[in-house]
Amino acid sequence: MALRPARCYRTIERRSYTRKEYVRAVPQPKVVHYVMGNPSAEFPVQVQLVSKSDILIRHNALESSRIAGNKYILSECGRTGYLFNIRVYPHEILRENKMAAGAGADRISDGMRLSFGKAVGTAAKVKKGQEIITIGVNPEKFYAAKEALRRCSMKLPTACKIVVTKGKELIKD
């Protein structure tokens, strides 16, 4: 069965479901790396992507965002010239109660009986003002980091703002 659209899971409608014993198997998140670049270096400028609303971000949107941003910043700064960090983890389990459609579906389908649903993916619960991605760079590569975060935000289901949290005085306009 195909992946449902993200709009089905985007809003936070209720509190997190914590009874994991009912969920048989949780699919692995698609996000492969959470820290990329040079984690041992200290960068004077730090730029963050901040959410403008409360939202659930699916794991495949996070992975897509990571690939887009990391690819750009890697080409601009080189392998050791930046630190790219994803600050959220997809803990929320997304469930789907599959419904049969078509002729004779009423005889096959259970309807709302046993409607708990199967786990189809994971998502990160993000609050308004929470940092999603952080990039650390040298001052001369600030605009490359800003563009990388803009590309990251295009892949996410929420409006985001780019905030300089460290080294604002080092940036030349």
UniProtKB/Swiss-Prot annotation:
Single GO MF annotation: structural constituent of ribosome
Q: Which GO terms describe its biological process?
A: translation
- GO CC terms on record? ribonucleoprotein complex; ribosome
Q: Which UniProt keywords apply?
A: Ribonucleoprotein, Ribosomal protein
- Judging by the UniProt lineage, the source's domain of life is Archaea
Q: What family is this protein classified in?
A: Belongs to the universal ribosomal protein uL16 family.
Q: What is this protein called?
A: Large ribosomal subunit protein uL16
Organism from which the protein derives: Methanococcus maripaludis (strain DSM 14266 / JCM 13030 / NBRC 101832 / S2 / LL)
Gene assigned in the entry: rpl10e
